[in-house]
From Swiss-Prot:
Name this protein carries in UniProt: PF03932 family protein CutC
Family: Belongs to the CutC family.
Any Pfam family: CutC
Naturally occurring in which organism (per UniProt): Chromobacterium violaceum (strain ATCC 12472 / DSM 30191 / JCM 1249 / CCUG 213 / NBRC 12614 / NCIMB 9131 / NCTC 9757 / MK)
Origin: domain of life: Bacteria
Keywords on record: Cytoplasm
HAMAP family for the chain: CutC
Subcellular location(s) of the protein: Cytoplasm
Regions that span the bilayer: none
A single GO molecular function term of this UniProt record: copper ion binding
GO CC annotations, alphabetized: cytoplasm
InterPro entries: CutC-like, CutC-like_dom_sf
Amino acid sequence: MDKILEICAGSLASCIAAQEGGAQRVELCDNLGEGGTTPSYGALAMARGRLNIALHAIIRPRGGDFLYSALEFDAMAHDVEVCRSLGLDGVVLGLLTADGDVDVARTRQLAALAGPMAVTFHRAFDLAREPEQALEDVIAAGCSRLLSSGQAASAPEGAALLARLREQAGGRLTVMPGAGVRPGNIAGLAAASGCIEFHASARGQVASAMRYRRGGVGMGASGVDEYARQETSASQVRALREALDKA
């Protein structure tokens, strides 16, 4: 069976680079420094118009934990409807209860709103209290895919749990490793986990084209370089694709 490479892209340019590099699917996010938040309507609409590969979008109203207020949940529901109206192929979301369990009721509501779109439960799973039960809850909520590092700092470190989760799922859901996936470890991860879909960022730093640069004034958190950003590299995606094809 062909192996699938999904790239987490933080901009339209990154989406295009992912496609050029040979990815079969893109997850479009904003604010990757916070783990990804919901992208803008404009970014979603333009990505849908420019991509020939599958396009998913993260539905996450803010950084931080995955326990959402009623207002935040309502915003997530509206964002799911926007993605459906734009013709996206899927949405990526994750909700937990205060006790660290999957919020089955709310996840099921969003999955129902998604309609024909695929629903991936993201790495909120990696903060869940009990992974085997969390997997059953994700399946019961109507998700078709789980993105996980195996509750470890990286997917290669969590490969043993990922393999167990894949076996437990038994084809009811696709387990997709993500976090720390690189050309040098993706083949080993495929062998250790038995998974066939993989999630990576393949990012590199891009310097700002600004010639005039005012020092001492920041627009965000202290220590953040205002004149550099991370973008998906088509060459890194291509290296991942080639390594995965040989796995």
